[in-house]
């Protein structure tokens, strides 16, 4: 029955992947709808909507799903979501910021607090950790668009503030480029970069840590579990942290 068992395992993994993909599309749709409701339903006139659509495209979200999310907003349909932010500490003293879109603050707050409490962390008050981060715009490209020098040159020309490149080591880790810009310049810089690097995988507001906290083997697994639990919550859009897990520790985690 080994073959049958293997088939079941494959189907289980596929089911889990499909579920995760569906949840991701749901979050992307929510952001598109909120962005369209807050501004014009035309992405050329609404930078936040344009960024949300780009993020959806980067995750291969079907065009019909994107169109439905915009249409829902333009007709005033769907739930009204509120932007909320939670701050706290994870295992090893790692500072964590959680951004969510919710139609029920009490539900989301309870879920986030429980996630922290059950995974070695604790939820703090508003402003508890954000002072250790800088609010910036973030433009993301895959490593394949060019080497560090090419991307750095394009970023400087476009008006970016900083570039962090990881060129990867093969198909499983193709690398990426993170281009940091001032919040007010985000979409202007993104448009300039499109001329030389093409359309970005992600254009969004982000929290960049001023300093990073190194995480040891004792805390790394619990920290990653906390982040997974938070990201799996339907209301949570993004989780930011100031952690740095060394490569040798990541290897021991498999």
From Swiss-Prot:
Alphabetically ordered keywords of this record: Cytoplasm, DNA-binding, Transcription, Transcription regulation
Keyword Lipoprotein among UniProt keywords: no
Keyword DNA-binding: yes
Biased composition (Basic residues): 1-14
GO BP of this protein: regulation of DNA-templated transcription
UniProt signal peptide: none
GO cellular component, one term: cytosol
Gene Ontology terms, MF aspect: DNA binding
Domain of life of the organism encoding this protein: Bacteria
Location of region: Disordered: 1-22
InterPro entries reported for this sequence: Integrase-like_N (IPR017856), TACO1_YebC-like_2nd/3rd_dom (IPR048300), TACO1_YebC_N (IPR049083), Transcrip_reg_TACO1-like (IPR002876), Transcrip_reg_TACO1-like_dom3 (IPR026564), YebC-like (IPR029072)
Subcellular location: Cytoplasm
Family statement drawn from the similarity comment of this UniProt entry: Belongs to the TACO1 family.
HAMAP family in alphabetical order: Transcrip_reg_TACO1
Name under which the protein is recorded: Probable transcriptional regulatory protein Saro_0419
